[in-house]
Amino acid sequence: MTRLFIIFLLLISHWCRAQESLLLLKANKIITCDALNTTYKWVLLKDGIIKRLGNGAFKTNKKVKTIVYDGVIYPGFIDAHCHFAAYALDQYKCNLYNTRSFKEIVDKLKAYEIDNKRAYIYGNGWNQYDWDDPTLPNSKQLDTLFPNKPVILKRIDGHTILCNKKALELLRLTKIDNITYKNLLELDKNGVATGIIKEDLVEKLDLLISKQLPLKNNAALIAMEQYFFKNGIGGLVECGIDSTTYALEQELYRKGQLKIPNYYFTKYGFIPDNRQNKGDNFKFKGIKVFLDGTLGSKTACLLHNYINTSSKGTLLVDTNRLDTISILCYKNKWQLAVHAIGDSANRIALNTLGKYSINKDLRWRIEHAQVVDSSDFKLFNTYSIIPSVQPTHAISDHKWVVNMLGNESLETAYQYKKLLNSAKWMALGTDYPVEDINPIATFYSIVFGNGIKNKDNEMIIDSISRVDALKGMTIWAAKSVFEENNIGSIEIGKKANFTILSTDLLTDNQDKIKNTIVVSTIVNGKEVYKKRK
């Protein structure tokens, strides 16, 4: 009898502990993003996993913690293409984002030098298309102001640098190099370097000064995670990290100092030994390859010349090498993510990857797919290749892209609806820090065809449906990295990763969505961000 009583007490104790671990979340609506687009009023969690969903009354007791949200619960938003660590690790650099002229840049550099006594000056984030005069400057003013110190000013896309003579001297370019890099080293009419370098030379200069760079900035990475949470991001795909970034992030995840789910691709040439941490929130997915450059730097590889130039851009990896990388990924069952912006690069990527991905579920991705020839859209479906796109790029670029590509670009550039119609699904991201991490801006841009900060409602790009846009930031983003069984929708058995907003993205009007507030972000059942009242 005594033994039975003890067993009874143990069962009661276990039941009480189980009840204490239960968390009930209630909201105005829960949008699940499941196959039927089901909605609910409450969700029950246990140990960070979704256990039950419902609309009617839930019989609870004081052992079940209940939180009521005045808002709408969504699956945790996933940024399907961003550079999580890039901006955080660049905090020591002179911030040139949103500058409106080269004069403003010079003023910032002068102020920066007073407070930063480094052996060089490194600035980051300028975009000449934000200036009143978008003409690229040369190094003369930098040479005059900083004759004895290397000055490196990287464009917002990371594919172009303006530097002074002292920085160019670090490259030690020979006459042979000048021929090798003729498309990447800008020369004036007299054959003198202007200070503008691109692509491989950018990487080469970065490597030369990397030994002088701060190796650790843990606090900045942790702060960056909170910035993502504040914007409603509950997971991310980090596209193209190097060994240094990997080591920093892996250590922070191991210590539990970073929690945001991170599904990462490494730059080609680096494969980590330890590809998944115990917390299952820092997971290697595959290799990222840069096939071409960018439109802003005029290095995206096109089928036709850029307007008023004799250049079609730059192919950074030849077809044979891309084929070799494809074989490597295929044999190792890794995903392959190819940066392809120009229509020529996209055609090469589609046809090369397609040899291995056709009729197979490899989930290989083309990142950006900004310019695609009309005859090539169908290949995304034919070869089962995922378009991974960033709608806010189209908003940022629309003022100058026609002048760069011609009127034909209106049919081939930033054609997200055509991509979706072909591929049947797509992953949406921001390319942060090139664009802001704001997922509401992503949704707004691709649904309403305009920028969230624009005052008019003129359609800039063809829109897609609200449901498809939401899926692109949730279940399709998860599917793009083989995580759809764990995250991306609110279903029983999945992780409790939620984004809670003040608005209903599927029904509220355009102006109301523009003013959406992130109420809370939840990862693994724990509130990692809550809007202060």
Segments from the language model and where they lie:
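Bacterial Sec-dependent N-terminal signal peptides
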Residues: M1-S21
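Divalent metal-binding segments
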Residues: E20-A27, I31, A35-F270, V289, ...
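A structural microfeature
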Residues: K51-R52, V519-S520, Y529
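Short beta->alpha connector loops
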Residues: I241-S243, Y268-F270, A369-V372, D504-L506
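Acidic (Asp/Glu)-rich catalytic clusters
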Residues: Y253-G256, R275-F282, N359, F380-T382
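Hydrophobic, small-residue-rich alpha-helical packing segments that form membrane-like cores
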Residues: F270-P272, F284
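Non-cysteine beta-strand/loop elements that form the S-adenosyl-L-methionine
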Residues: K283-T299, I385-I395
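His/Asp/Glu-enriched, well-ordered alpha-helical/loop segment
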Residues: I327-A337, S344-W364, H368-A369, S375-K378, ...
